[in-house]
Amino acid sequence: MFTEIVTLSALVKITLTMIKEHEVLVIDDFISTEYQEQIKNTLIGEALFNGHEFPWHYIEDVTACGDHDSQHRPALYHQYIDFINEDQKPVVDSKFHDLFVPLLQRGSFKGLGTTKVNALQGRSFLQFPLNLKNYDVDNPHIDLVEGHKHIVVLYYVCDSDGDTIIYNETKESDQYTVKQRVTPKQGRVVIFDGVLMHTAEQPLNNTRCIVNYNLG
């Protein structure tokens, strides 16, 4: 089994630029090709990780969890770390969390200036093309409770459609203005200030698979 090891010399190659307020960083080939393939083959292939097959779970709504005004677009989901509330330590829910530690060390170094990984929440989503009645984007949201300072490390497992859309707004709004759109590409990571509202387009042509962690 391939194992990614993050060394100091490898981190030196990553320009250290701590995330500024409301900043968005998009970096291609953030991890080695071998590591990219390991993640892809584990999540959407047939590879085992430490002898275990990756499990997916059904959710009825990919962003809003069944809110009445949401698009109710189903997906598959896997939770690595559960954020309960600000007063309790996040809980590691999955043995597959270890697969992403090297990725998160790089993300933490790039976004926070430290290799120490303080993961507050971690999830993956797997979306399939749908026959849509409308093409509205999924509900804009933030990943954690409002006011909880964190960065988002969003990794794309494979090439697909279904852009990530990051807005200028930091609170719910009747009208959103687009700050940046990012197209899913294998090996690409998006690191941004977690206060920014964001969402994703529903894929129409390809399977969309992401790894989403919130670091503090």
Model-predicted segments: where are they?
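Non-heme Fe(II)/2-oxoglutarate
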Residues: I5-T7, L11-K116
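Catalytic core of non-heme Fe(II) oxygenases with the double-stranded beta-helix
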Residues: D93, H97, V101-G216
